[in-house]
Amino acid sequence: FELETTLEHKKKFDLLKEITEILPPHVSVISVRQPQPLGLGHAVLCAKSVVGDDDFAVLLPDVLVKDSSETNDLSLMIQRFDETHASQIMVEAVPDHMVDQYGIVDVASIPAEGHSIQMQGIVEKPAVDAAPSNLSVVGRYILPAKIMQLLENTPKGAGNEIQLTDAIAALQATDTVEAYRMKGQTFDCGSKLGYLKAVLHYGVDHPKLGEEFKALIKELKL
C-alpha cells in the first residue's frame, strides 16, 4: 500500500499499473508466520485459522511450475477436485535411476499428462529397484479442510516435525487421494542450479526483455 501511494503521488502511473496488476483485485494476501521449522505439515497447520472450513491448495514456493498450455496444471487439479472430491497431489515423471532422491507415489499405472489416478501412498526416497513408480511429488496439493484435524492428530516424527505426507496417509483411510501428472515443467529453486535454470527459461520468454536476454546469451558464445 505504501509503495502504491508513493508511486501515485510521484505520478509514476506506468509503474503503479505494473505493481497493481500483479495481484488480482479479488485476491487478498495474508501472512502467517511459522514460529519454528517443524515440518511442512506444521507449516500448513499454522494457517488453520485462516483456511477455516474451506478446502485449499498448498504451493511450495521453492518449486516453480512453468505451464505448457493455456490451462495451467493447478487449474486442472482444482477442476478434478471439484468434480470428484478426491484430493490431488501433483507429480512428474523422473528418470528411473533418480527415484531414490524423491518422494514417489504408489499407483497402479502411469496416467497421461494432465490426468489423475488413485494413489495408494507415498514412499520417501525408495531404493531404485523397489520404487512403486517413477512419479515424484512436485509440491502442489489440493486438499480438503478435514486434513487440518488430521494434522493436529499426526504424531511428531524425527526432529519433532509434523509431516504432511503422514496426514495424507491418514486421509486415505476414508477418502480417495489421486496423483495428478503435470503437463508443465518444474524448476527446483531450492538448489542453486535449479534457480539458474529458472532464470534462463523465464528470461527468454519474458514479454518485454526476452529478445534482449536471448541476445545476451548469444554474446556469451557458450
Regions from the language model: what does each represent?
Residues 16-27, 111-116, 170-172:
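Short, conserved catalytic or adaptor-binding loops enriched in Gly and charged residues
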Residues 2-3, 81-84, 114, 131, ...:
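Terminal amphipathic alpha-helical/low-complexity segments used for targeting or macromolecular assembly
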